[in-house]
Amino acid sequence: MNQKQHKRSAFSGKIGFVLSAAGASVGLGNIWRFPYLAAKYGGGIFLLIYIILAFTFGYTMIVAETALGRMTKKSPVGAFASFGKTGGLSFGGWINAIIPILIVPYYSVIGGWVIRYLADYIGGHGSELAADGYFSAFISSGPSAEICFAIFTVFTLSIIFAGVRNGVERVSKVMMPILVVLSVVIAGYSVTRPGALEGVKYFLVPNIANFSWMTVVTAMGQMFYSLSIAMGILVTFGSYMKKDVSIEESTENVEVFDTAIAIMAGLMIIPAVFSFSGGDPDTLQAGPALMFITIPKVFESMGLGTVVGILFFTLVLFAAVTSSIALTESAVSTFEDELGWDRKQATILIGIIMLVLGSLSALGYGPLARFTVFGMQFLDFFDFLTNSVMMPIAAITTCLLVSRVIGVEKIEAEVTLDGKPFRRKRIFNFMIKYLCPIFAAIILVSSVANALGVISM
């Protein structure tokens, strides 16, 4: 490893960290995945379980990863290696570092889809987006999907070139407040549609009759998507955090911000779908197709559908961008630390990786459709590998590092550097030692079992 030293970047303060970390968390996992999972797994009961997990499981992992990063001032590989270079510790650091490198290419492909939809709405082609077969025709087109992916990738890389404070932080400070305003406006419009209040009730009021074990497992899995845990981002962002910034308060800000946006996303989509379909179960459980196939049909049935479509896909684009720059920044930080490269060199390398792996996903439903990995298209395979296998393993290794190697006392010392008490210390200690690794193991086993057809999620 090249040990050439470089001056470590830093956020300007608490607001910079919170908005950047919230930007990393508030991505397609909130706007796209959360609403369709809530619709599929019982609405209000899913939301209740998710909130409980966010303020226990999610909170613990955010504190642990952020403290680990700030304590070592290193990206995941170096952070883990700071406490020993045994095989297990080295593996934990590398798996946390590799995850964003594998996610951001296919994530950028989906970001490219969002660009295409936004452009079509701006061009007044909303009725075409609502037509049957539009989405499948677009993603199988090859060149069109590749161009949109390339545009999104270049935009992401241009922000990373600008650095942590002038790029990641500045963009997050601009986009996140706009995202909040757009979510409130769209949710307000959605819940006032005829028949939408039934959707509000379904989403917000827990119904124990809708409870199942899979509701809990799925809500656990959503934690990884929604809070950006176990993918190296929070370790990296923690390494950019100043010592006088409160880790616990910042974590609370991030979890509240993230959960609020997830709820707003549910209020944007579920009531609108109820208004459109009358609560038809098949429509509610459309899964990933909900945003790109069902929602355009919903907007087409509304008054001001084109305007709402523009606002909605602008919001989704902002969410995708803030998350993609966080993923890319984590990868760049790893290359800088482990290879001793400067930001320009590291950004060019991740750019090449994004274009190569992303092109496989962008073309995987078209010219490369006949090539699959374990029966999955490239995008689906990378998504399964990272989110269902690698991230739970990364979470387990982080829990073991903190609880068995570093010791919770050192984490507490890092958290209280600002002079304030660690208010949820008991919850943190219990979760990181016992429940968090168990939860991560459950997610890993259930995800693999689902892929093998043993269970159905």
PLM regions: where:
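Membrane-interface "cap" regions at the ends of multi-pass membrane proteins
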Residues: 1-32, 61-66, 70-83, 87-91, ...
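Select transmembrane alpha-helical segments in multipass membrane proteins
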Residues: 10-21, 45-49, 87-101, 147-152, ...
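Helix-loop-helix connectors at the membrane interface of multi-pass transporters/channels
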Residues: 2-4, 78, 111-140, 241-244, ...
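Extracellular loop-to-transmembrane helix junctions
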Residues: 38-64, 144, 390-394
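Inter-helical loop and helix-membrane interface segments of multi-pass membrane transporters/permeases
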Residues: 5-8, 36-41, 76-95, 108-165, ...
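Membrane-embedded translocation segments of transport machinery
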Residues: 2-7, 11, 169, 173-321, ...
